[in-house]
Amino acid sequence: MSKILIIEDEAAIRRVLVKILSEENTNYKVSEAEDGLQGIELIKKEDFDLILCDIKMPKMDGIEVLMASKKIKPEIPIVMISGHGDLDTAVNAMRLGAFDYISKPPDLNRLLN
């Protein structure tokens, strides 16, 4: 079973992602964090196969989470999620080591594949 961490400050979006990825037929174990600091604490404690991380968050933004995560566990792929379909942000995230970048609302078919 693959373990996924969702780091998203918007509760409604986080709930939808958790629900979709936790369904019986997906074979994922999903953990969640409501901000970057909480996400980093989970990354330190657990091993994840994938991290889905929002970019615009209070306390610690997604780019900071990406950089910190790459220092702690560089092997975990991180997909950045943002409501701001900004190409510069996407390019910057990829340059810093993000595996991929998707816009909100995420394309569920793309997310599951």
Question: Language-model features: where?
Answer:
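Two-component/phosphorelay signaling modules centered on CheY-like receiver
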Residues: A11-S31
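Receiver (REC) domain active-site loop signature in two-component systems and cognate sites
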Residues: I55-M57
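Conserved phosphotransfer cores of two-component systems
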Residues: E24-N25, K44-E46, A68-E75, L96
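Conserved acidic carboxylate
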Residues: E8
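Acidic catalytic/metal-coordinating carboxylates
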Residues: D35-Q38, D61-E64
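C-terminal output helix
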Residues: D86-D88, I102-N113
